[in-house]
């Protein structure tokens, strides 16, 4: 089942009945694009949630945020494959195909929070008592944003699963692409033609946003418990992101479980399917262990 978040478009004042409207447009007017790898980009009016319900639900649901550097969403390896795995275990899934920020930094989180509102509204109907969030790479940043920047109990996830997540926007930790796609390209902030006062004002805002969207800064005792996975040899998103999030959770007395594998790189997704005929799956040696530990963790928190 696919639910459009903004059936009248993002320029409308109101969106889905269960949502709080688009509030803001990302300015994208061109057509949405997709490719054979399952990537989808230029999402605007078509922002949506794909709902997957198992034959027999165990009471859990996960709102999934695929990765893609805030430029596209990897809807196959970090979306549909997740839904297949989860529903086979009785867990309902909502894959969010959120609008691209294009420098409108609030937009992805607005869409995820509206997805939570929709799912909470229909939870009893679907037999759901616990709704968490899961994210990969930049989608991990979005999932961590949902976990730390929620606005009420409806939008607060009951738990988080973060897979090779971006956590900090510190230039030392994160690639320029993800940061620029979320906050806007450097020239938007560093235009030397601006008057001095305007330039200084923009620089202050930029550094404020870097701090705000470095999500470890918002972790406290009310942050949802988390399951975190990363690989030591990840060159795109260094493992320090996960360590930073985990450490702040522990310092705040929040339950957390972290697994760091020595090899696997970045973007290995939730299934080995994508690797068939396309090179070596560097995470193949650890997939079974990863799936077993995640399944056990989800089962344990369901019983709490």
Language-model features, listed with the residues they occupy:
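N-terminal cap/lid segment of alpha/beta-hydrolase-fold proteins
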Residues: 1-57, 105, 284-288
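Mobile cap/lid helix-loop segments that gate and shape the active-site cleft of serine hydrolases
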Residues: 25-34, 169-218
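Primarily recognizes the serine-hydrolase "nucleophile elbow" in alpha/beta-hydrolase
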Residues: 114-178, 210
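Short beta-strand/loop motif that positions the catalytic acidic residue
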Residues: 222, 228-230, 234
């Amino acid at each position: 089942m696919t639910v459009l978040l903004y059936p009248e478009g993002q320029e409308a004042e109101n969106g889905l009945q269960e949502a709080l409207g688009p509030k803001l447009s990302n300015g994208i007017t061109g057509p949405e694009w997709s490719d054979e790898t399952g990537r989808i980009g230029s999402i605007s009016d078509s922002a949506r949630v794909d709902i997957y319900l198992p034959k027999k639900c165990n009471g859990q649901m996960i709102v999934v945020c695929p990765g893609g550097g805030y430029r596209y969403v990897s809807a196959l390896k970090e979306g549909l494959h997740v839904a297949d795995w989860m529903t086979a275990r009785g867990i309902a899934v909502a894959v969010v195909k959120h609008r691209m920020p294009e420098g409108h930094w609030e937009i992805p989180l607005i869409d995820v929070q509206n997805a939570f509102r929709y799912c909470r509204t229909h939870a009893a109907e679907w037999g759901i008592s616990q709704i968490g969030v899961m994210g990969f790479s930049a989608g991990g940043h979005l999932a961590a944003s949902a976990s730390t920047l929620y606005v009420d109990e409806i939008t607060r996830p009951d738990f988080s699963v973060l897979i090779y997540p971006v956590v900090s926007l510190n230039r030392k930790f994160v690639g320029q692409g993800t940061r620029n796609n979320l906050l806007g390209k450097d020239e938007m902030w560093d235009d030397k033609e601006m008057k001095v006062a305007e330039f200084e004002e923009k620089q202050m805002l930029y550094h404020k946003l870097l701090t705000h969207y470095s999500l470890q800064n918002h972790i406290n005792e009310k942050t949802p418990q988390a399951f975190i996975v990363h690989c030591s040899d990840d060159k795109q998103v260094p493992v320090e992101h996960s360590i930073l999030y985990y450490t702040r959770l522990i310092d705040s007395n929040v339950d957390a479980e972290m697994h760091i594998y020595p090899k696997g790189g970045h973007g290995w997704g939730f299934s080995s399917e994508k690797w068939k005929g396309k090179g070596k799956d560097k995470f193949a040696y650890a997939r079974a262990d990863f799936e077993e530990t995640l399944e056990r963790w989800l089962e344990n928190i369901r019983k709490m």
